[in-house]
Regions:
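Peripheral docking tails and interdomain loops at the edges
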Residues: 317-357
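Short, charged, surface-exposed secondary-structure boundary motifs
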Residues: 37-46, 105-110, 239-247, 341-344
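Acidic/His-rich segments in extracytoplasmic proteins that coordinate ligands and/or metal ions
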Residues: 55-126
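A charged, amphipathic alpha-helical module
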Residues: 3-7, 114, 118, 122-249, ...
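Redox- and metal-dependent alpha/beta enzyme cores, enriched for Fe-S-associated oxidoreductases
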Residues: 12-34, 211-281, 285-290
Length: 357
């Protein structure tokens, strides 16, 4: 197998098995809902559909995406399934695969997802990648674990407030890491970590941020301009993609099935988003937000989701009630994956921060 070092495989969900893609010899490249593209998605998708999905399709139709060897879609929601369907019409030149993603964690679902990862490994090989090898997969898992560890150290410094424009800088690093191979990114983060502490560089009101898609660094700059200091976040386009995935390979042998099955288990057990259900603890998402907000020292919580996101629409009332019961101030924002939409919320953000002072 001969492969260019920048042979990209596109993805659009934080549940994508990046280490498996990397072990096959590809560079995972997140297709973000950014860029200045004409609104064309309405020709293939309903207008009242997730703007994250529509903006990605706009980029694909406008050919404002990197040269991709293939595209991986995780079956995370109905809108993402529709994007998979539309992609085959919009970009038949870029092969794609839809990987089914269970909504709950159980032994049966882990076994099912393991089968899906095996299927993905076979497709990656058909696309020109390397055959699944346990040593290569283990090496890739170690690289992404190291990357996640570096981000954890940066997050700690951002939470402490000793990096000027910390949240904005961290988001810029997340964005770059989502389109860059882990090896060079590790070096860049080491340089970032070597910066000396600037003392209490950010003196804004500490706020915890959660939601799904909010990639724009300008949005984080706006929060800072409004007087907020983001001391913790849980976003699909932020920390959720770069937290360590626990892969406990307790098998006595080195069969690829053993490591891959544990990887499947680790992915399903990572920090859940709104589309993931914990059947015996239906309010766990709200509890996670409260726990994270308290650990970060936040005075309030801001939620930001894209419009028409059914999983979050269903969860927000319970989250709001739980935060109210705990006495934690809460502001809910909604956007369409443009800086303009978050900018329109400036007055509400400023008023919320002023209330927290």
């Amino acid at each position: 197998m001969i492969m260019d070092k920048d042979t990209f495989i596109g993805f659009a969900c934080s549940y994508t098995p990046l280490a498996l893609v990397h072990a096959a010899g590809f560079t995972p490249c997140r297709i973000l809902p950014d860029g200045d593209c004409p609104d064309q998605a309405g020709h293939l998708l309903h207008d009242n559909l997730c703007p994250h999905v529509k903006r990605i399709l706009d980029r694909a139709l406008s050919r404002q995406i990197p040269d991709l060897t293939g595209m991986i879609f995780m079956n995370s929601c109905d809108a993402m399934r529709r994007l998979y369907d539309a992609w085959q019409v919009a970009r038949p030149d870029i092969p794609c695969i839809l990987v089914d993603l269970p909504t709950t964690v159980s032994e049966r679902n882990i076994a099912f997802f393991f089968g899906e990862l095996q299927r993905l490994a076979g497709v990656l090989e058909k696309w020109g990648g390397a055959r699944l090898d346990p040593e290569k997969l283990a090496a890739s898992l170690q690289l992404f674990a190291r990357l996640a560890g570096q981000f954890e150290k940066i997050r700690a410094r951002v939470q402490a407030g000793d990096l000027r424009n910390g949240a904005t800088m961290l988001q810029a690093a997340y964005l770059k890491a989502s389109v860059t191979a882990p090896e060079p990114m590790i070096g860049e983060l080491e340089t970032l970590l070597s910066q000396e502490s600037a003392g209490q560089a950010d003196d804004g009101v500490p706020v915890y941020l959660f939601g799904n898609v909010l990639p724009e660094t300008d949005a984080f700059a706006l929060f800072a301009e409004c007087g907020a200091r983001i001391v913790g976040e849980d976003l699909c386009t932020g920390s959720r993609l770069f937290t360590e995935i626990r892969v406990d390979d307790d098998s006595p042998d080195s069969l690829p099935d053993s490591l891959l099955k544990n990887y499947a288990k680790g992915l399903l057990n990572r920090q859940p988003c709104a589309r993931t259900m914990i059947s015996d603890r239906p309010g766990e998402l709200a509890a996670d937000i409260i726990r994270a907000a308290r650990l970060s020292g936040a005075k309030g919580v801001i939620g930001h989701t894209v419009k028409f996101c059914d999983p979050y629409i269903a969860r927000i009332p319970n989250i709001r009630a739980a935060l109210k019961q705990e006495g934690i101030p809460f502001l809910m924002l909604e956007g369409d994956c443009t800086v303009r939409s978050i900018g329109q919320q400036k007055t509400r953000i400023e008023a919320f921060i002023e209330m927290l002072r």
